[in-house]
UniProtKB/Swiss-Prot annotation:
Residues 1-71, 161-198 are annotated as: Disordered. One of its GO terms (molecular function) is RNA polymerase II transcription regulatory region sequence-specific DNA binding. This is Transcription activator of gluconeogenesis ERT1. InterPro entries: ERT1_acuK_gluconeogen_tf (IPR050335), PAS (IPR000014), PAS-like_dom_sf (IPR035965), PAS_13 (IPR056751), Zn2-C6_fun-type_DNA-bd_sf (IPR036864), Zn2Cys6_DnaBD (IPR001138). It holds the Pfam family Zn_clus. PROSITE patterns: PAS, ZN2_CY6_FUNGAL_2. Residues 73-101 bind DNA. GO terms for cellular component: nucleus. Its main location: nucleus. Belongs to the ERT1/acuK family. It comes from Postia placenta (strain ATCC 44394 / Madison 698-R) (Brown rot fungus). One of its GO terms (biological process) is cellular response to starvation.
Length: 393
């Protein structure tokens, strides 16, 4: 029994020894396989081990390499394509444009320009179009004080077929276009409100404004007329409502006008009269009855549609110290001053909508829907009010 027990561990250790030796012998083989697998590299001569890759010849570029031209032709330059030095180039020959193959225009850098070239501005290029009259040129006789504005008006005139020709009559075959009347009455030297609509548009009208306005406009006269006018038309309650509305914005106006010098007020009046010129153009293009007046209510601009709606003549309203509230019914006057007081110093981009009853010269009422917007001057004072009406049928 003792001999058997002593031999049993030897019998059990034999397999472990053999397995360990086999594992030790197998480990170098596995490591050698891993090392050989990681060290496998692609041949440097470009050939592969497979038969398919060895059978294919290497790819080569067909033909000589294209050389970039020093200067592309006009068509290749416009298409942003590579050109060659030959004229005509191969691309133009293939496309059948060999006769028009010319050198492209290369813009010169500013530091390479001569003094004469810098002094001469490039004329604006206008492509010819058979739809428009051939007599159109970029130098149309418009005197708007701006080359860009002259060009735009010239293009519009050419589209409408009314390109101005100072030497001859207009084209009889062109459609006639109605233009807004331009009264030729000059400024009378006073900053009168009616003179704003009597100025011709453009740079000439602006120059007349700057020369004519020599003193500030007296707004107190308009409020004095209002105080005299109220007792003749309104009862005590309506007068009280209007006076309360005036008391809302009048102190703010006085406070903003206190630091202004006489030169500032003259400048504000010039800006006001200048804005009337531009507003007159807009009113002439609009078909809505429109009137513009000062913050005191004094009318300064009247559209022809408003005269057709109410029966008033333009000469009766402009230039005669006529006030807009004289054309309103009593209740409309009260509502207007209350709305003006609430929106005088608010956002000027919004309009105020209300109901209004206009009065004809005979006293006949004309019920309308009414909206007005308030424009401020450079000193942030409400200066110009633009009103529009639509009749209620």
């Amino acid at each position: 029994m003792s001999s058997a027990l002593t031999q049993q561990p030897a019998y059990r250790l034999a397999p472990s020894a053999s397995s360990s030796t086999s594992d030790i012998n197998a480990a170098p083989d596995a490591d050698s396989k891993k090392k050989t697998g990681t060290k496998r590299r692609r041949p440097q001569d470009g050939t592969s081990d497979s038969a398919d890759s060895s059978s294919q010849p290497p790819r080569t570029r067909e033909g000589p390499k294209k050389k970039k031209a020093n200067r592309a032709c006009f068509h290749c330059q416009k298409a942003h394509l590579t050109c060659d030095d030959s004229r005509p180039c191969q691309r133009c020959v293939k496309r059948g444009m060999a006769d028009n193959c010319t050198e492209g225009h290369r813009k010169k850098a500013k530091y390479l320009l001569d003094e004469e070239e810098l002094a001469q501005p490039d004329p604006p290029y206008v492509p010819p179009d058979p739809m428009f009259p051939s007599s159109y040129t970029a130098s149309a006789p418009f005197s708007l004080g701006s080359e860009g504005a002259n060009l735009e008006y010239s293009i519009l005139s050419a589209i409408l077929g009314n390109s101005p020709d100072p030497t001859g009559p207009p084209n009889s075959g062109s459609p006639s276009v109605s233009h807004a009347p331009q009264p030729s009455a000059p400024f009378n030297g006073q900053p009168d409100i009616g003179a704003g609509s009597a100025i011709s548009g453009g740079a000439q009208g602006a120059a007349a404004v700057y020369q004519a306005v020599t003193k500030p406009y007296d707004y107190t006269e308009g409020y004095h007329f209002l105080m005299k006018h109220l007792p003749t038309r309104f009862d005590k309650n309506d007068i009280l409502r209007i006076v309360r509305a005036l008391a809302i914005f009048r102190p703010s106006l006085i406070a903003l006008q206190m630091p202004l010098s006489e030169e500032d007020e003259v400048f504000v009046e010039k800006c006001f009269q200048r804005s009337l010129i531009e507003l007159d153009k807009l009113v002439s293009f609009s078909g809505t009855p429109t009137v513009a007046w000062r913050r005191t209510g004094e009318i300064c601009l009247v559209g022809p549609e408003f005269c057709m709606l109410t029966g008033w003549e333009k000469e009766e309203l402009v230039g005669r110290r006529k006030y807009i509230y004289e054309l309103f019914e009593n209740q409309s006057v009260v509502e207007y001053w209350e709305n003006f007081a609430n929106h005088a110093f608010e956002n000027t981009t919004q309009s105020v909508y209300s109901h209004c009853v206009l009065l004809k010269p005979s006293g006949t009422p004309v019920p309308c829907t009414f909206c007005f917007s308030i424009r401020r001057d450079i000193m942030d004072l409400p200066s110009l009010v633009i009103g529009q009406w639509l009749p209620l049928l």
